């Protein structure tokens, strides 16, 4: 695909929408001057967070360095000046939404979520109230349901369908609402009220769905306020006064609600979604009449005009903003928003909307047109039935046989290609279930299988558990979009051109009768990794146990938040070296950041403090912890607080978790220490040589002759085999090493951890060798290199069995 001709075709179709031709700066100038830090990165997660510009941040820092700001609750000169700037910021926000200051107030919060929480906490719920919300809402909106239900109110979701049947003067005839079942709680202490007082109900919907990009008709505000009885068929849930909440967190950057035309009662958003900075700051735009109904209990500094400490008395401030903003607001962040609005106002939101949606339409059309060589379509896009779409495209992809590509595979390969995107359900469970066709039974089944947010279980029971999302911001370009489309086509469309690249090389098993002529294999290296994700040590011989190599991954480091630390997040762990002396019965640990070498007794140690139980990836472990001296040593070694834990269960653990599922583990039923999938990883020297040859060739093409070369230890194998053909190990169903029998569990799925270079003197992250492996070692969503093994111990009790370097490896033999 030629970029010049492709762009020419794009401009013929979208030229009047794309590029800000009538602005002081066009898109190419904006990218060249304001976003140089992107370099070759393609950033496509603007729905998650858009980017700040260089001139914006220069203005922010210049302002902070030249202006004296004080606490706006003080009465000093600088504080009064700060208060004035905060007031101007409120007006700027209201103007952005075309909201009259006579009708609306701007309450600053820590973000859209905090604004939603404030509405839920203070809304005048009663047992006669209803909370109605569209299915396609963010979790932060769904959380309001807890406040409603706890006060005895009813809660229910609705599907909103845009029918567009014929011409109509009224928008009501084009919108159809389908009600889901009513949710209620019968909790003690909930006051059951009659119909004597006013009943207030709340309806919440997003201006744009963050999952699909579907834009919702703002006429919903008037429809609900004036026609709730018709829509809800005069049920008891339609009675009372309806207030409307718009979650504009996703939509505000390109098409903010116009509050002069559509009178919503509450609008929430975050500033980093608008222009990247500041984070931790959002706002609740509230209609003044609605604010009078809000029942706030807590008061704080700045929210009262008077309070008496030893008497039940306080007097609230009259201003809406003053009473609802607890404590000192983030005034330095608030002063920064004026600099963010500059580029938005220069371009105008209408131009930003046209620019971003033209790019999204291009991507949408290209993805829909992709076909495999057998004629099957590649992409399934979500939200296409909507009349209007925002600058977001969410989709999944299928192989020629109709099975799904996992979204984690897409994300992994995109990262290697320099493309930043988002995968999963995007904290929008209703939209996720709706578009993916997941029933309640499907969702519960996935949960039973151990699936949680942010995990790697992207395909369960033959269905995707989430999707791939790309979203565009005001600084996105056609070139970004085309690079992404090319990435999808080259990595996921099966054609005669790229079929070989998308299938792993496999080796046929030796033909009977000529096995004697096959190359002989020998064990050339044994490596033990006592502490998970830290450096290991090589030995000539080592004892085998029912859990694998003796003491292999018997220890782990845990963060103060309970997270198990690995090189994926703490690459500095590769510099922690380990050594076990079996004769001395000690584990020795060293780090360049620690002067003293740490020594830990293997059998009994004064450093041990207590035993405990903990769950890791749904498996229960008995662990031993160590005293503060040990934890301080490791915390210094990785420059973050952590604790050292040892697996103290003599039986170790089975791979089956408490849900009856193996999770990511493949060594089902085996006894394991803190390994991810299996007891052993075996790598072939010939496979490493072949990979390095490919890396050298790719380096010449991509980097002008500079090539990355990797050693076998980059892959953290326990066992290294010599001789034979590259990837011969792929065909081994079992191996015999010096009379010890091992069962193959298949290939090892590689992750970005192999891109960390531990030999450079400092931690360096590359795209290689994983990017090259992805080009020829992909199989069913995984990038395979090396094989996983399980030791088949013939005896029921632990025996004195050793494995030794130099022993012959005999593949695919009979077990004796």
Curated annotation (Swiss-Prot):
InterPro entries: Aminotrans_V_dom, MoCF_Sase_C, MoCo_sulfurase, MOCOS_middle, PyrdxlP-dep_Trfase, PyrdxlP-dep_Trfase_major. It comes from the Eukaryota. The keyword Transferase applies. GO terms for molecular function: lyase activity; molybdenum cofactor sulfurtransferase activity; molybdenum ion binding; pyridoxal phosphate binding. Its EC number is 2.8.1.9. Pathway: Cofactor biosynthesis; molybdopterin biosynthesis. Its cofactor is pyridoxal 5'-phosphate. The modification N6-(pyridoxal phosphate)lysine is found at residue 273. The active site is at residue 427. Residues 647-812 form the MOSC domain. Ubiquitously expressed. It catalyses: Mo-molybdopterin + L-cysteine + AH2 = thio-Mo-molybdopterin + L-alanine + A + H2O. Keywords: Molybdenum cofactor biosynthesis, Pyridoxal phosphate, Transferase. GO terms for biological process: Mo-molybdopterin cofactor biosynthetic process. Belongs to the class-V pyridoxal-phosphate-dependent aminotransferase family. MOCOS subfamily. Sulfurates the molybdenum cofactor. Sulfation of molybdenum is essential for xanthine dehydrogenase (XDH) and aldehyde oxidase (ADO) enzymes in which molybdenum cofactor is liganded by 1 oxygen and 1 sulfur atom in active form. HAMAP family: MOCOS. This is Molybdenum cofactor sulfurase. It comes from Solanum lycopersicum. The gene is FLACCA.
């Amino acid at each position: 695909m030629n970029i010049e001709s492709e762009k020419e075709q794009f401009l013929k179709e979208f030229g009047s929408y794309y590029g800000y031709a009538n602005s002081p700066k066009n898109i190419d100038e904006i990218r060249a001057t304001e976003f140089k830090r992107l370099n070759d990165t393609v950033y496509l997660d603007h729905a998650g967070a858009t980017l700040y510009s260089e001139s914006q941040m220069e203005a922010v820092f210049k302002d902070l360095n030249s202006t004296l700001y004080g606490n706006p609750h003080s009465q000093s000169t600088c504080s009064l000046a700060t208060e004035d700037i905060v007031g101007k910021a409120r007006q700027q926000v209201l103007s952005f939404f075309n909201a009259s200051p006579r009708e609306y107030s701007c309450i600053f919060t820590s973000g859209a979520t905090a604004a939603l929480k404030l509405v839920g906490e203070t809304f005048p719920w009663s047992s006669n109230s209803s909370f109605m919300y569209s299915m396609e809402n963010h979790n932060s909106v769904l959380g309001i349901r807890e406040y409603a239900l706890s006060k005895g109110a009813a809660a229910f979701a609705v599907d909103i369908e845009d029918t567009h049947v014929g011409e109509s003067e009224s928008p009501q005839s084009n919108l159809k609402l389908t009600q889901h079942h009513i949710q209620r709680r019968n909790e003690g202490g909930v006051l059951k009220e009659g119909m004597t007082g006013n009943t207030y109900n709340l309806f919440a919907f997003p201006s744009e769905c963050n999952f699909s990009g579907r834009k919702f008709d703002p006429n919903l505000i008037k429809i609900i306020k004036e026609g709730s009885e018709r829509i809800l068929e005069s049920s008891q849930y339609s009675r009372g006064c309806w207030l409307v909440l718009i979650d504009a967190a996703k939509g505000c950057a390109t098409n903010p609600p116009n509050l002069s035309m559509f009178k919503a009662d509450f609008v929430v958003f975050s500033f980093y979604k608008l222009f990247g900075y500041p984070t931790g700051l959002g706002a609740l735009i509230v209609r003044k009449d609605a604010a009078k109904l809000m029942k706030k209990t807590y008061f704080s500094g700045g929210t009262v005009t008077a309070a008496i400490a030893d008497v039940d008395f306080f007097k609230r401030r009259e201003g809406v903003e003053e009473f609802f903003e607890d404590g000192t607001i983030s005034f330095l962040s608030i002063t920064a928003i004026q600099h963010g609005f500059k580029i938005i106002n220069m371009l105008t939101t209408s131009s930003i909307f046209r620019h971003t949606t033209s790019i999204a339409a291009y991507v949408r059309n290209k993805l829909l047109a992709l076909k495999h060589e057998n004629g099957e379509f590649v992409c399934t896009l979500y939200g296409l039935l909507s009349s209007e779409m925002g600058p977001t495209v969410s989709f999944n992809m299928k192989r020629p046989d109709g099975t799904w590509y996992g979204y984690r595979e897409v994300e992994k390969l995109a990262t290697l290609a320099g493309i930043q995107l988002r995968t999963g359900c995007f904290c929008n469970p209703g939209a996720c279930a709706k578009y993916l066709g997941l029933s309640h039974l499907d969702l519960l089944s996935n949960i039973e299988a151990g699936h949680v947010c942010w995990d790697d279980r992207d395909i369960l029971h033959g269905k995707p558990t989430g999707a791939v999302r790309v979203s565009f911001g005001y600084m996105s370009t056609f070139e970004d979009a085309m690079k992404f489309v090319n990435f999808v086509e080259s990595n996921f469309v099966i054609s005669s051109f790229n079929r070989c690249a998308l299938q792993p090389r496999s080796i046929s098993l030796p033909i009977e009768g000529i096995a004697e002529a096959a190359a002989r294999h020998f064990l050339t290296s044994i490596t033990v990794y006592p502490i998970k994700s830290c450096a290991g040590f090589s030995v000539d011989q080592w004892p085998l146990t029912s859990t694998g190599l003796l003491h292999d991954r018997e220890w782990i480091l845990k963060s103060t938040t309970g997270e198990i630390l690995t090189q994926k997040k703490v690459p500095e762990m590769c510099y922690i070296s380990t050594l076990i002396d079996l004769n001395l019965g000690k584990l020795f640990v060293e780090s360049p950041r620690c002067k003293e070498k740490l020594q830990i007794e293997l059998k009994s140690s004064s450093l041990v403090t207590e035993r405990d139980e903990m769950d890791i990836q749904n498996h229960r472990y008995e662990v031993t912890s160590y005293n503060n001296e040990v934890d301080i040593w490791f915390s210094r070694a990785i420059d973050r607080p952590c604790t050292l834990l040892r697996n103290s269960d003599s039986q170790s653990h089975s791979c089956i978790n408490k849900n009856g599922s193996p999770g990511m583990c493949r060594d089902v039923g085996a006894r394991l220490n803190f390994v991810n999938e299996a007891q052993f990883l075996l790598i072939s020297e010939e496979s490493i040589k072949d990979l390095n040859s490919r890396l050298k060739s790719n380096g010449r093409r991509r980097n002008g002759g500079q090539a990355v070369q990797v050693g076998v230890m980059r892959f953290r194998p326990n066992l290294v085999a010599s001789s034979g053909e590259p990837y011969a190990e792929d065909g081994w169903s079992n191996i015999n090493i010096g009379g010890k029998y091992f069962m193959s569990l298949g290939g090892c799925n590689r992750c970005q951890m192999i891109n960390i270079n531990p030999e450079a003197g400092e931690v360096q992250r590359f795209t290689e060798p994983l990017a090259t492996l992805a080009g020829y070692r992909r199989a069913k969503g995984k990038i395979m290199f090396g094989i996983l093994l399980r030791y088949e111990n013939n005896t029921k009790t632990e025996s004195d069995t050793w494995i030794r370097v130099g022993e012959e490896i005999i593949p695919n033999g009979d077990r004796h």
